[in-house]
């Protein structure tokens, strides 16, 4: 069976349930069942490097590449329910990530543009990525706002919710810079936060020669450990809220 995360009846959440009984039926009712979409317990490798041996942490990342990352991270239940090659985008048919884009769109995670395009090869922006991350969880209000994200900004709710959860951060000048292209390192940092994945720094230090690592990544880089967390599949346990790696997969 599926792991059900929510049952929505007539637009109202009923919480996780194995079954739901309609009572006093006098008109048509709507029923929506949501399944867990992300692999939160299985720490697979979801980021890959390049043939030159680098991971290019400061490079931009395309909308297709982000689609591929989250496709790898889909739970088995979500794959079973949402996998498809059907889409309505005008520019995805020949994309290498057509299945990934179609599936995540079917799951309600990805959205295209008003002109009918998806723009798979375009660099994804900070606002767009925050919106994608936010769709994996319920939106929450909060006091974390940014000077360049007004309340009428299309991604205001997603950005402020993600900031409240600690998934995204702004800059020291109080801005979020929503239209800036997000970097690969920033994507990994946010994705790990969404998945509640934290790197075992001691394990990395003691076993570096066994790990997938990169020639453009030094231990002084701010996302060094996050990138190792995302690049190396591993078994782990949690001790005192800290992730302890047991072995590599």
Per-region residue spans from a language model:
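Surface-exposed interfaces of beta-sheet-rich extracellular modules
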Residues: 1-21
């Amino acid at each position: 069976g599926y792991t059900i995360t929510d049952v929505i009846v007539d637009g109202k959440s009923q919480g996780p349930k194995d079954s739901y009984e309609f009572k006093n039926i006098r008109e048509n009712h709507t029923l929506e069942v949501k399944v867990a979409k992300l692999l939160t317990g299985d720490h697979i490798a979801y980021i890959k490097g390049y043939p030159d041996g680098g991971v290019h942490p400061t490079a931009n990342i395309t909308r297709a590449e982000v689609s591929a990352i989250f496709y790898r991270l889909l739970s088995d239940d979500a794959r079973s329910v949402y996998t498809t090659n059907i889409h309505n985008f005008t520019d995805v048919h020949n994309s290498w990530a057509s299945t990934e884009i179609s599936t995540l769109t079917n799951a309600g995670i990805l959205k295209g543009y008003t002109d009918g395009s998806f723009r798979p090869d375009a660099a994804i922006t900070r606002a767009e990525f925050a919106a994608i991350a936010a769709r994996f969880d319920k939106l929450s209000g909060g006091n974390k706002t940014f000077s360049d994200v007004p309340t009428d900004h299309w991604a205001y709710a997603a950005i402020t919710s993600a900031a409240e959860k600690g998934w995204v951060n702004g800059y020291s000048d109080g801005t979020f810079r929503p239209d800036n292209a997000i970097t690969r390192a920033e994507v990994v940092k946010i994705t790990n936060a969404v998945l509640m994945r934290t790197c075992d720094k001691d394990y990395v230090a003691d076993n570096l020669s066994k790990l997938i690592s990169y020639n453009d990544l030094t231990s002084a880089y701010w996302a060094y450990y996050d990138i190792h967390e995302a690049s190396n599949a591993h078994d782990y346990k949690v001790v005192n809220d800290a992730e302890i790696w047991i072995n590599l997969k």
